[in-house]
């Protein structure tokens, strides 16, 4: 469901295999080692919720999923820039100070229903807002949906 490579201290898989990892290879990603999370692993980490009304939704929704800082902590990731890659190749990134200042989650569900492909899933990077703050175009660029890969470091 999610592969994380780069400056991580804990790994559970070897290098990219272009035949078996065709979606990763299609995006021209490459790594020697990584950590691969399945849904159960992500659900076992401390979870967070975010209630927001992104442009893709007609009404506010409650999103839930593992806290990004917990995902990164679990794999002993360096506190450096993290790049998020969506299935369609779209990328976004966060710096450590961005991650520390807000409760970012990798949302697995909205209103209790899993986010599927075509519904901003399997994972949607989304965060809490200050009281009264609403997402705008500047924020929306960080809300990467259909996330399946993260790279820690350049």
Where do the language-model regions lie?
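N-terminal intrinsically disordered, low-complexity segments enriched in P/E/S/T
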Residues: 1-154
């Amino acid at each position: 469901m999610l592969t994380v490579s780069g400056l991580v201290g804990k790994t559970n898989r070897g290098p990219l295999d272009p035949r078996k990892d065709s979606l990763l290879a299609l995006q021209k990603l490459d790594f020697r080692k990584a950590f691969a999370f399945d849904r159960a692993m992500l659900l076992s980490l401390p979870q967070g919720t975010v209630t927001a009304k992104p442009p893709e939704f007609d009404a506010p929704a409650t999103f839930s999923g593992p806290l990004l800082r917990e995902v990164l902590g679990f794999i002993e990731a360096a506190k450096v820039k993290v790049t998020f890659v969506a299935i369609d190749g779209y990328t976004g990134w966060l710096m450590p100070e961005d991650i520390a200042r807000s409760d970012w989650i990798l949302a697995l569900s909205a209103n209790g229903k899993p986010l599927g492909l075509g519904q901003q899933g399997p994972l949607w990077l989304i965060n809490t807002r200050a009281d009264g703050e609403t997402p705008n175009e500047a924020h929306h660029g960080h809300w990467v949906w259909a996330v399946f890969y993260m790279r820690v470091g350049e």
